[in-house]
Amino acid sequence: MAEPPVPILMYHAVATDPNDATRVLSVSPEAFARQMEIVAESGCTPVRTADLAARWRDGRPLPARPVLITFDDGYEGVHRHALPVLAKHGYPATVFVSTGWIRGAYDTGGGLDTMLDWDQVRELAAADVEIGGHTHTHPQLDQLDDSALRHELIHSREIVTDEVGTAPVSLAYPFGYSSRRVREAARESGYGQALAVNNALARRRQGPYALTRLTVRRATTAEEFERLVQGRAIARDFARDRALTKGYALVRRARQVRRKVSRSRV
């Protein structure tokens, strides 16, 4: 019998009044609370990213109706608004932090809104939240040369290890972009699994370094969210996203070709 696919939910900011840069991919605290109620009502079992990957890697069975709750970048509202709701339900989650965006000694000033500080990251880790890597400056990894790529992966992993006390084993690719070269670099940098986007259900056959996620945004209705966690009508709900993604992929490939030609002439 084939293993059922798993919905991996991708959140960003949880905020009452997000700024323009984060609004579309944010959710309100009230919406997040309702969404977690839907997870409970649907009989789903939240698991952390590392736990899902380990079960698939070892061939162990998954819990009933597994779902992953993940947050990218490291916005302060994850601690302020999401953590109390997660704690209320006893749900584990994964937060993927861009270390150069977290407030503190390594802050590059690139954060798009109010970000977590390292004390808050440690409090999340102590509350059954897996802290994953999301690079240092949030670049498009497949557009970097080998040296810059490895620096982004290794430097950010070292910072999380120093600040949290545990090396991150899960990675989320910024913007969801990767390539065979990026996935190999992630493995060599010490990550055991990595998440993309693609707005599709995750399946074991995707491999540990290309697990797909589902975007939860401010426009996601309760009915749409229920379909996400139940794995229904995914292609229909994300049809527009996929069309835009395909178009942008052509643009990005053209840019890569131009860069390769330019480097070959140097």
List the predicted regions and their residue ranges.
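Metal-dependent polysaccharide deacetylase catalytic core of the NodB/CE4 family, i.e.
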Residues: 4-15, 21, 65-67, 75-79, ...
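C-terminal domain-boundary segment and adjacent tail
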Residues: 26-61, 161-163, 187-208, 246-266
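Membrane-proximal basic amphipathic "stem/tether" segments
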Residues: 212-266
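PAPS-dependent sulfotransferase catalytic core
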Residues: 3, 18-33
